[in-house]
Amino acid sequence: MSDIPFWQTKTLEDMTDAEWESLCDGCGQCCLHKLMDEDTDEIYFTNVACRQLNIKTCQCRNYERRFEYEPDCIKLTRENLPTFEWLPVTCAYRLLAEGKPLPKWHPLIVGSKAAMHAERISVRHIAVKESEVVDWQDHILNKPDWAQ
């Protein structure tokens, strides 16, 4: 049996569903709402978390049934990955699609999410609950480093 991790030997297309799912580092960046300018199609990042995101753990409260609770939730697949230009530069799906390695803090490498949180990759330090937002425009972020 090889000691080389699956993400270094398989393409995204060749990964099993379990391998595909395990690539997600659980940072929660995908679960922050984005606003789109209707005239320019420019995407603005906010710090407003989806109602299903547990901000402390950066995990979806209802992952298996998320589309029932959040019809606008978008499922990232092998087929639609190229259309998600807004994925963070730290996203394993994006990195592997671009032929780049996983970052040293990635949970698949270090075995836990602690390093990711320590590096402030996760949204737990910036996210606010959707229910607490009055004016969404007040929550637009300058383009975060992770979105470059």
From Swiss-Prot:
InterPro entries referenced in this protein's UniProt entry, alphabetically: Puta_zinc/iron-chelating_dom, UCP006173
Disulphide linkage map: none
Domain of life: Bacteria
Any Pfam family matching the protein: CxxCxxCC
UniProt cross-references to PANTHER family, sorted A to Z: UPF0260 PROTEIN YCGN (PTHR37421:SF1)
Family classification: Belongs to the UPF0260 family.
Protein name as it appears in the record: UPF0260 protein YcgN
